[in-house]
Design a protein with these regions (language model features):
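Bacterial Sec-dependent signal peptides at the C-terminal "C-region" and cleavage site
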Residues: 1-9
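Acidic, serine/threonine- and glycine-rich low-complexity intrinsically disordered segments
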Residues: 148, 156, 160-290
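Extended non-globular C-terminal regions
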Residues: 224-386
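Extracytoplasmic/secreted cell-surface and envelope-processing proteins
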Residues: 26-31, 65-71, 119-130, 158-163, ...
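Well-ordered, non-membrane alpha-helical segments in soluble/globular domains
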Residues: 32-45, 82-98, 124-141
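VWA/integrin I-like adhesion module and closely mimicked acidic/polar interface patches used
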Residues: 118-177
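Von Willebrand factor
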Residues: 9-115, 119-120, 148-152, 155
Length: 386
């Protein structure tokens, strides 16, 4: 039943390529012989992903070129010794294009770039160049429809040349690129690594194909859930017992950013209607055991996240009724915490507390492709027959 519906579930990538920007604007994260949250978090994430990589990290500099790769073990030593301090500048569109052209999404390969994502044109033409930058990003993403993106924002100390503190919480980005299912899985992992080092700020998805989230039907009242079709069929509904048949649709939220698991954001994300005219009510349940986002379920490195919607079917005139429901990502898209919004709206490229021009990057991706969910509804047959 309902073979036309594609269910979205996170899936770990088969392989990962690791990239890191080494440019002048990143120097404060790389200063020698000083422990920073950047070094701790990046190494935690890179070493955690190491078993899926080719054992190398690919630095990027000189306008956006992919430099000679560094063996992962040597990368940690060089990072701690300040050997990635650089006088080069990078060009984000070139950097992005070079990375995307080296991703084989047919083999579930994902790329991860660590960067401050600052694009800083100079002089009188700066405003015009920023708009052109947004269009460049749009074109790159538009011409590569197989690639979805997610970001995780973290903060770290940013150091002056003498090792003194220039900014206590300077933001940077893990940018994840690949298939939607792979990107979502790795976004969860990287966000958890950042949370573990107390550096997590925000995460978000771009150009994602969410389809229909994986779900299950639970707690059927006045009916029985079919063991053969547990996603689509409820039998033995008895109007003489009660006018109402109710059940819970549990939406798997693992595929969505952490910010999404909020009652104010997703209260109207699920909509339902009947095919033959019966009444249908939908309610998001907000009690602790019904709206859950556990980033380390049972102390394992695993996210467990779901939202329960109570469905009530009543005023049923026939022996059978079909409920059609959809879950939309639209209330979720672009909903960020205030701290992150403040970071991406800074107007001074030298403001180390912000992500100068990252809002232009986000707008460029959105202008190319929106996050989408399937329009085809899920159908649940509620029958009075066994």
């Amino acid at each position: 039943m309902d073979s036309t519906v594609t269910l979205f579930q996170t899936r770990q990538p088969e392989s990962i390529k690791l990239y890191i920007e080494t440019s002048g604007s990143m120097n404060g994260f790389f200063r020698a012989n000083k422990p920073t949250n950047f070094k701790k978090t990046v190494w935690s994430a890179f070493s955690g992903m190491a078993h899926k990589t080719d054992g190398k990290v690919y630095p990027m500099s000189n306008g956006g070129d992919i430099d000679t790769p560094v063996i992962l073990g040597d990368f940690r030593r060089k990072m701690n010794a300040g050997q990635f301090v650089s006088n080069f500048s990078t060009h984000i569109p070139a950097m992005l294009l070079n990375i995307i052209q080296n991703i084989d999404t047919t083999k579930n390969e994902v790329a991860v770039l660590v960067s401050d994502m600052k694009y800083s044109p100079m002089g009188e033409s700066a405003a015009t160049e920023l708009l052109q930058y947004q269009e460049q990003i749009r074109n790159i993403i538009g011409y590569n429809p197989n690639v979805s993106l997610s970001f995780v924002c973290a903060t770290s100390e940013y150091l002056n040349k003498d090792g003194s503190m220039a900014e206590e919480k300077s933001p940077y980005i893990f940018l994840i690129m690949g298939n939607s299912e792979n990107v979502a899985a790795l976004r969860n992992d990287i966000a958890r690594w950042c949370e573990a080092t107390d550096s997590y700020v925000e995460s978000g998805d771009m150009a994602m194909e969410y389809h229909t989230p994986s779900y299950e039907i639970r707690e059927v009242k006045n009916g029985l859930l079919s063991p053969t079709y547990p996603r689509n069929l409820i039998t033995t509904y008895d109007r003489e017992v009660s006018d109402t048949c109710s059940f819970i649709i549990r939406i798997n939220m693992n595929g969505f950013p952490w910010t999404a698991v909020d009652s104010e954001i997703i209260k109207d994300a699920l909509t339902a209607k009947s095919v033959y005219g019966s009444s249908v009510d939908v309610e998001l349940l907000t009690e602790q055991d019904h709206l859950v986002d556990d980033h380390a379920y049972q102390r394992n490195f695993e996210r467990r996240s779901y939202a329960d919607y109570l469905i009530k079917l009543y005023n049923v005139a026939m022996d059978d009724e079909v409920i059609e429901w959809n879950f939309t990502n639209q209330p979720i898209d672009g909903r960020y915490f205030v701290d992150f919004n403040n970071m991406i709206t800074v107007t001074d490229e030298n403001d180390l507390s912000g992500l100068f021009s990252f809002n232009k990057f986000l707008d460029g991706v959105v202008n190319a492709r929106l996050n989408t969910s399937d329009k085809e509804p899920v159908r649940i047959l509620v029958s009075s027959y066994q």
